């Protein structure tokens, strides 16, 4: 690219930064998030992400695209209609959740019961906030449950996931201290 022209973060460059940060900080969610905050923010500044990816069958949303996939790491762009709510659920792997467009209420939970009673789960919120475009959160053990709701029409999110989702996922009702198990439509 000629000197002096602005450059955009490419999806590949962002993926390379995430891979490097995962090697250095993978077991420490706060350090990992700090290391990838700048490249993720630069990627989220792009106005063309909706046209970059390829279609993906979503697990919790109707519209989802792969922006990047290498067999382990995936970047997923998705849309949630205004008022659309994704029930609290787990993944079995860490996930970065970021807002690309609009605002979303995002809550991260950790499970506080011992898991010994089928269908019963007591959750405690560890991060509950309204996130705006450009903001990100890590959903990782032991706080590896999250749910979200779109507060604006056209709200879009980006998730970065390493590994496969577990096939049988828990979908929680925090008010009723309960969960149901559902089979994931897509493990990646």
Where are these regions (language model features)?
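N-terminal leader/capping segments at the start of a protein or of a new domain
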Residues: 1-46
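A short glycine-rich, His/Asp/Glu-containing loop-to-beta-strand
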Residues: 53, 57-82
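A short hydrophobic beta-strand segment most commonly corresponding to one strand
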Residues: 96-98, 152-168
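Short acidic-glycine-tyrosine-enriched beta hairpin
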Residues: 111-146
């Amino acid at each position: 690219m000629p000197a002096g022209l602005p450059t955009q973060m490419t999806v590949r460059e962002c993926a390379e930064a995430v891979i490097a940060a995962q090697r250095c900080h993978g077991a420490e969610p706060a350090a990992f998030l700090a290391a990838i905050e700048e490249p993720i923010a630069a990627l989220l500044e792009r106005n063309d992400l909706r046209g970059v990816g390829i279609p993906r069958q979503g697990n919790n949303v109707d519209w989802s695209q792969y922006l990047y996939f290498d067999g382990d790491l995936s970047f997923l762009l998705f849309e949630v209609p205004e008022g659309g709510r994704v029930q609290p659920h787990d993944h079995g792997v860490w996930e970065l959740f970021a807002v690309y467009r609009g605002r979303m209420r995002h809550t991260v939970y950790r499970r506080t019961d011992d898991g010994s009673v089928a269908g019963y789960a007591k959750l405690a919120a560890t991060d509950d906030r309204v996130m705006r475009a450009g903001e990100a959160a890590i959903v990782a053990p032991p706080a590896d449950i999250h749910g979200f709701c779109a507060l604006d029409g056209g709200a879009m999110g980006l998730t970065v996931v390493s590994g496969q989702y577990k096939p049988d996922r828990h979908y929680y009702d925090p008010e009723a201290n309960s969960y149901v198990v559902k089979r994931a439509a897509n493990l990646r």
